[in-house]
Amino acid sequence: METLNYKVLEGTGYNGYILKDAPVKVMQFGEGNFLRAFVDYFYDIANEKAGYNGKVKLVQPIGNFPQMADWINEQEGLYTLYLRGSEKGQKVDAKRVISCVSDCVCPYIDGKWDEVLALARSANLETIVSNTTEAGIAYTQGDSQFDQVPPNSFPAKLTRVLFERYKAFNGAADKGLTILSCELIDNNGKELKKCCNNYAKDWNLEPAFIDWMNNANTFCSTLVDRIVPGRIRDPQELAALEEANGYHDAVLDVGEVFGVWVIEGPAELEDKLPFKKAGVNVMVVPDVTPYKKRKVRILNGAHTGFVLGAYLAGFDIVRDCMHNDTIRGFMNKMLHEEIIPTLPLDKKDLEEFASAVEDRFNNPFVNHELMSISLNSTSKWKARNMPSFLAYIDEQKQLPKCLTMSLAAYIAFYSSDIQERTADGLICKRPAGNTYKIQDDAWALDFYYAHKDDTAAQLVHAVLTNTQMWDQDLTKIEGLEAAVLADLEKIRTEGAEAAYKSCL
């Protein structure tokens, strides 16, 4: 079977949107599945819907997989993207051939770093995008030199690219770039800017350049939200798709339908970027923090809030939980009545985000295992659920029923017929009879193993007073110890599903 390129695609009779030739306006550090299913998808829609007329040049931030660049280039930048999931309760399986990518370069191959620097000198270049993993935004003194081909770290590469542009345009203020950092760390844009400043100082670059770098360029922190499985794992399904498409695609990509990109920047950036006009789910806001809080407390908080009890009730994957009226009802009540009222964003926006969560959890293409979500639940409950729990008590002057029950479910999950403490986990037995392995910090597992013979009352007291877990003594919250004990006993005697139902 022929490999995808423009000629092969034309021969298949594909009638979707395609843009073959356009100037390169975006330099993207990162060629992986996530950026291609997320950022490049948005740029592709912008070409179609907003007349952006721009291509994205991919730059591999590390040199350990140059074959990926070869695959992308053999396909002339084209690749097939499937967005799969559930939207408003309906199954979605949408295919689009993405044509916004010009090519991909591995700067560690002879001559290719020069290609990157040449793009830095281009008047057409407007934006730099990056996703170089959480470890990518880092500064280590002396690890990268100005004249290295290329410098080792990503921030060092970026500093060198910006200096090349500064020189090419004699420090013109209107030739600065918008830099959109997608790495999964807090304040990613601000951290990247700090690293670039450190390299500029290490390399003794002229003060006028440092001034231009900081003031003519806009370093944006961004929040990304789309689950990207990245590939189709079933070889038979993949073969059937290639047969239907009429070509082989070495870099085919798969993402969920839901996707939102929140960019922290000045208001005028919204008109500078092509996304608003394209009508895609990208927003420019003065502060990304409330949106991060929204994601952590609603999306992640929902997961941690219901999955532990759901597992004890006999469920194994998230989608099946969404098909159960009790579990789904418990999650929705927790979200809409206990979590959303404590968040500092527009209520309509929060309600829509929460509704999308149910669709995302109901994705017919993803078997998201409850046990994989259960990893490190002690720190997860503290980070994702406790802030909503405490804020609700502070505002409503009463205990939130569902969040209190979820705390009891956490204790029940960690103490269900404990069998043994192994080197890498705590082996428990669920009511259905099978054993399961809890994975968490060693001190948390040691705590539950040490308390395995406690009465329910002793265990609840020990958990709530454990300041290593919660940074405070939760028994000081009026009525909480008695409520958690009652909920734990209900889970143990009537089952977790019945306990969840009692909250509705």
Question: Where on the chain are the PLM-derived regions?
Answer:
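Substrate/ligand-engaging "lid" and interaction regions
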Residues: 1-504
